[in-house]
Regions:
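Helix-loop-beta element that forms the nucleotide-linked donor phosphate-binding surface
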Residues: 151-170, 177-180
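A conserved mid-protein helix/loop that constitutes part of the nucleotide-sugar donor-binding site
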Residues: 12-19, 194-201
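A short, histidine- and acid-enriched strand-loop-helix "catalytic/donor-clamping" loop
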Residues: 108-126, 139-142, 172
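Conserved donor-binding/catalytic core segment of Leloir-type glycosyltransferases
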Residues: 180-197
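N-terminal strand-loop element at the rim of the active site
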Residues: 8-12, 24-64, 77
Length: 201
């Protein structure tokens, strides 16, 4: 079995679980495909995605052309292959690789964030989905959505695909921190204050 993961960049929130997939006996090949390793703004936030390229038993293709991905697809003709696409609506490269995959008898999945409702109500997301995405649903076997709140929303659109709640993950490293001796409450927020995060100050 081949497992291919298409992303806009190498993600520290996905590589830890992707690396673990290679230990299963029926998995022959795990490949991560992205047009770039990282973005400059994410490097400034502390991302060190280039270090993730060193994980064992995972191939990385930093693809600058559709031909590179086509060559990968061609190498798997007749093999049990699963393609998982992240950012399918947001990144042109991922969209083109998804469309190219439709020429092959692969099984497909989407890894997606749920609809973000702080800018647009759900009915507008539904309208966009019906107009833009519905035509592709028949080509997908799985949809992995972050959290469980919108599992039923995606199940509504099709009985064909299996919808599963999903989470991002990071590599676990054991840490020992001294317990502060103080009566003051201290709160540490780790994250960005971008509108997309919907942090209410």
């Amino acid at each position: 079995m081949n497992l291919f993961f298409f992303q806009n960049c190498i993600s520290p929130h996905q590589i830890p679980f992707i690396e673990e997939l290679s230990v299963f006996t029926d998995v022959d090949r795990v490949v991560v495909i992205a047009p770039r390793v990282d973005y400059d703004d994410r490097k400034l936030m502390g991302w060190k995605a280039s270090n993730l390229l060193k994980v064992s038993n995972v191939e990385f293709i930093i693809a600058s052309s559709v031909d590179q991905v086509k060559k990968l697809y061609e190498s798997c003709k007749g093999e049990d292959t699963y393609c998982f696409f992240s950012g399918i609506n947001a990144f042109a490269e991922v969209v083109s690789w998804m469309k190219l995959s439709l020429n092959y008898p692969f099984k497909r999945g989407v890894i997606t964030e749920p609809p973000l409702l702080y800018h647009y109500p759900l009915w507008q997301h539904s309208l966009r989905f019906a107009l833009k995405d519905w035509k592709y649903v028949k080509h997908f076997n799985y949809l992995l959505v972050m959290g469980d709140e919108f599992v039923n929303y995606y199940r509504f659109w099709s009985k064909r695909w299996k919808v599963l709640p999903f989470i991002y993950c990071t590599e676990w490293k054991e840490r020992t921190l001294p317990v502060p001796i103080t009566e003051k409450l201290k709160v540490l927020y780790v994250g960005s204050f971008s509108d997309r995060k919907n942090v209410v100050a």
